[in-house]
């Protein structure tokens, strides 16, 4: 079993990964010294979760290459987010499924994902305290187990092509306090932990609609989230010329 510290490991998410799949954050995530960044948030959700359901169109250079159908709903005493994404590319189609379970305070409990395309892969992740244990299954290979250790139990799961998960990041942001706020994150399909910094850009008008904008960034890149009340309606990754738009 390999153990990795999320506080010291250099990490990245490819803007465009194999088979034309768009990386979850479309960012490069790099860990930096604790002295140079704000400490990751360890407090629970600022805004309560609400049930939601919808579809995101995935566009690159203005052309739709896929879509995600998602739902966020209560699951007993916890909450579940289910996402199903289909991506079309010259190398073939890719189908991704992700299921995330979090406590009401936003702390993750369990996550599983699977992908079918040129190759099949799947994984389950169990969160216990500050440790995330991943069991990865790759087609034609033996199962592989890896552990990641974080500074605190509060970790945001942001996986490839499952954009509804950014809803949880927006809920964790303290809108009253505003300013830069740093969060520990895990990108399961890339097996990469790291941190992101989130800041409020304020109210914007997009296509005649008033929305709140959050900027998610690292030292290398950024992605903009647009929210109508508590609903995530748009994501923009300028460096990848990509947009994720709610239908």
Protein language model features and the residues they cover:
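N-terminal Sec-pathway targeting helices
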Residues: 6-18
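Bacterial N-terminal signal peptides
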Residues: 18-28
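Solvent-exposed helix/loop surface patches that form functional interfaces
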Residues: 35-51, 65, 118-211
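A short, Trp-centered hydrophobic/proline-enriched beta-strand micro-motif
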Residues: 48-60
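Short, small/polar residue-rich loop motifs at catalytic or cofactor-binding pockets
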Residues: 51-52, 95-96, 198, 219-221
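N-terminal mature ectodomain segment of secretory-pathway/periplasmic proteins
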Residues: 59-138, 230-231, 235
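Edge beta-strand at a domain terminus
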Residues: 146-152, 239-247
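Short, exposed beta-strand-loop hairpins at the edges of beta-sheets
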Residues: 216-217, 222-228, 232-240
């Amino acid at each position: 079993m390999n153990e990795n510290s999320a506080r010291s490991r250099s990490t990245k998410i490819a803007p465009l990964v194999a088979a034309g799949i768009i990386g979850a954050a479309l960012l490069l995530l790099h860990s930096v010294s604790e002295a140079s960044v704000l400490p990751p948030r360890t407090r629970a959700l600022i805004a309560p979760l609400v049930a939601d359901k919808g579809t995101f169109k995935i566009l690159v250079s203005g052309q739709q290459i896929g879509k995600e159908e998602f739902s966020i709903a209560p699951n007993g005493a916890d909450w579940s987010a289910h996402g199903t994404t289909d991506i079309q590319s010259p190398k073939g189609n890719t189908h991704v499924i992700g299921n995330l379970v979090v406590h009401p305070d936003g702390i993750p409990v369990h996550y599983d994902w699977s992908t079918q395309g040129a190759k099949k892969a799947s994984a389950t992740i169990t969160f216990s305290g500050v440790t995330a244990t991943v069991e990865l299954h790759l087609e034609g290979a033996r199962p592989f187990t890896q552990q990641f250790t974080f500074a605190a139990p509060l970790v945001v799961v942001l996986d490839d092509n499952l954009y509804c998960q950014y809803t949880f990041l927006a809920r964790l942001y303290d809108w009253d306090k505003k300013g830069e706020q740093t969060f520990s994150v895990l990108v399961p399909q890339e097996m990469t932990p790291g941190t992101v910094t989130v800041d409020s850009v304020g109210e914007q008008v997009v296509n005649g609609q008033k929305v709140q904008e959050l900027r998610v960034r690292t030292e290398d890149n950024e992605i903009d989230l647009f929210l109508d009340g508590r609903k995530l309606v748009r994501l923009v990754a300028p460096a990848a010329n990509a947009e994720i738009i709610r239908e």
